[in-house]
Structure formats: structure tokens, C-alpha cells
Design a protein with these regions (language model features):
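Conserved N-terminal entry element of GNAT/NAT acetyltransferase domains
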Residues: 8, 34-62, 73, 180-182
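Conserved beta-strand-loop-alpha-helix junction that forms the acyl-donor binding cleft
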Residues: 143-154, 169-175
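Terminal substrate-recognition subdomain of acyl/acetyltransferases
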Residues: 41, 162, 167-182
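Charged, low-complexity interaction regions
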Residues: 12-19
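Conserved active-site alpha-helix within GNAT-family acetyltransferase domains
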Residues: 128, 148-166
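Active-site acidic-Proline motif in GNAT/NAT acetyltransferases
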Residues: 118-120, 124, 147-148
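Acetyl-CoA-dependent GNAT
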Residues: 49-114, 118-119, 131
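Conserved acetyl-CoA pyrophosphate-binding loop and the N-cap/start of the following alpha-helix
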Residues: 121, 125-133
Length: 182
């Protein structure tokens, strides 16, 4: 039985509340994902262009959210405040990675709001390619990253993003020399 199943069982047996389960799962997955491995050896390089790219729609993202729980935070619905855009790359029927953006209508800033590479495709050099795609093709210049996600922060730093603001939980980063958002 995996960690997720154990937490679900504990929840259903009223050992812990749903909120406690969510917090516990976040702590566990956060510690697995955000570590910077000093002895990391890259795997064989993969090219983003070798996978099938599809434009994200609300129905497509909802379909994949059921198969890939890590996508639960991905949104693809425009509002009065922002306009969403995004792409997924598939290897056959398997999700390789995705990037989502939002353009805020008030100041026209474009943000990377979600960027994920699925487990089997991590370590193959896709992160920089995905950021490149978001910056060059989607014109994103802003992002926020959780302070506990040290690996993502390191990747964004290496790409050239700079912190222009932070709070207790997040770094707000940009490629702009004079950030619009404050």
C-alpha cells in the first residue's frame, strides 16, 4: 500500500481529518519533489519536440487531472481578471509535462502558473526546455514558486529569473528588469 492509500484509509477510518490528510500528503510530496540532490546525474537527454504537443482546454485538463493528481492545481478557465493558456506534451497516451500561463488583463503581465514534469520524465533535461517554451512562445516573464520547492527555485535561478518580492511562503520572480507587479 502506498503513502496516498494509507492516508486515504486513515481518513476513511476517522483516524485523521481530511484537512490533516491534505497537510500530511503535502508535506510528504513536498519533501520528495523539492529536494536538490547534490549527487544528481542527468539521465539521457530528451527533446520536448519529440513528444506530441496539445493545447490545453478545460475538458482536456479535467480528463488528465483524474489520471494525474499532481495536476489538481492547474486551471484553464478565463476570468474577468486573467486569460489562461497552456500546453501538454504526450508520449503516446502518457503525459510527459505541461506548462500553463495566465495573462493578467489589468497590466498585461504573463505568468507561468503551472509547470510539471511527470515522474518518469524527470531528470531528462525537460525543465529548461519547458521554461524556454513558456518564455519564448507564450511570452511569460513572471512566476511564483513556493519557498520549500528548492529544486524549482534553483532551476528558475539558473534560467535567469530574479526574485523581486517574497512573503512567508512564496518567492515572486521575473525576467523583467523593472517588474510591473509589486
Amino acid at each position: 500500500m502506498g503513502i496516498k492509500e494509507i492516508i486515504v484509509e486513515a481518513c476513511s477510518d476517522d483516524i485523521i481529518t481530511a484537512t490533516e490528510a491534505i497537510n500530511l500528503f503535502s508535506i510528504i510530496t513536498e519533501s520528495e519533489v523539492s529536494k536538490v540532490d547534490k549527487d544528481f546525474k542527468p539521465k539521457e537527454s530528451m527533446k520536448l519536440s519529440s513528444f506530441q504537443k496539445i493545447h490545453i482546454t478545460e475538458s482536456i485538463i479535467e480528463e488528465y487531472k483524474s489520471k494525474y493528481p499532481d495536476l489538481k492545481h492547474v486551471r484553464c478557465k478565463d476570468t474577468d481578471t486573467y486569460k489562461c493558456d497552456g500546453y501538454m506534451w504526450l508520449d503516446g497516451k502518457n503525459l510527459v509535462c505541461h506548462v500553463g500561463s495566465c495573462e493578467y488583463l489589468d497590466d498585461k503581465t504573463k505568468w507561468i502558473v503551472s509547470l510539471e514534469i511527470t515522474k518518469n520524465y524527470k531528470g531528462h533535461g525537460l525543465s529548461k526546455q519547458l521554461i524556454d517554451y513558456a518564455v519564448k512562445n507564450m511570452e511569460c516573464k513572471y512566476l511564483s514558486v513556493d519557498k520549500s520547492n528548492k529544486l524549482a527555485k534553483m532551476i528558475y535561478d539558473e534560467y535567469g529569473f530574479k526574485v523581486y518580492q517574497e512573503d512567508k511562503k512564496m518567492y515572486y520572480m521575473t525576467l523583467d528588469t523593472n517588474p510591473v507587479k509589486s
